[in-house]
């Protein structure tokens, strides 16, 4: 027997009052599906609910945590609890008391489990009206709520981004007034809500709100100061911040890509120069990708992203400014690029889906000049990469005629960074001239490298 029919049976056969609650009711009102169900049970203890469920459903693994029980069944996550009041749970608290514990009006609605449709909706704080108006509003006075619980400020933005709703005016100004309090919130919580914003359907809309409220200035000041930093109108319609936010919109919904797109030009304010040459004025951002990659790594580590994510995003930013010129790039130059961005047999089959090229696509689409997402030169570049890749025997360290073990045996070296440095040096030689990939030749070159390095 499925869980919902069991609960309906419990509701009918006992004094229990059982209600759908919280985000699940919000989804029902919005006519959206949800794989998580929140249930509030009155007039009966949770222990009795657990017992009844086990009697009617075999092998049900129920977790008991203070105030509620949870389990997975029927492809759904269930949370069942008693009403809450001032941090305590009791089957004898009212729904009105429970609703007061919620943060947002749209999550403070209840529906009797026996109801057909939402006509019997119990709407304590007019949440349904806010859903109609596509508005995020808190229960109580916004200024007081955000001061008492500053985490609500980022949660407001992430919820609005998830639903594509606007933020209540009073709530926005409360966030703006109290934005500095976000420093008191756990960085893990801030990152959690930030990721939800970045991964939403249209992140730029809510990242702009994050900036306008002052939250971005506290959390990612390096990005905030990009506001108003103008660029060459020939290549960019927008300032640096708007360009970065638009690139984030245009990037596919992959966390690494979205983060790289958002931060790809974060180094520009640091290196911006205004130049007059030949009577013509222009703005330059030389090596902004180098500066930006270092900044992005620091930003992401400060936000407690894992090391692998920070390095991957930093690597994408560092390499995103490649400038392929067909007549100037030799075959060796193409091989160097292949090695640099780690193109292997797996990637060559779906080259246009490589993160570095997807980032370039998002970057180009965000310049505001209505250009095609992929330039003819990029198409030509990918074609040539395939051609060179298929012609080349050595493009990665693993393709070399010798490995680290040979180096250690030949030169009596111990495992360590030196081995990697030598192999990278040898790879650079073979990339320039594929015929150099011979054991004796590479050992001789390694010997030269070591004699130079040890001087």
Please report, for each region that a protein language model flagged, where it lies by residue:
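Catalytic cores of the polymerase beta-like nucleotidyltransferase superfamily
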Residues: 1-455
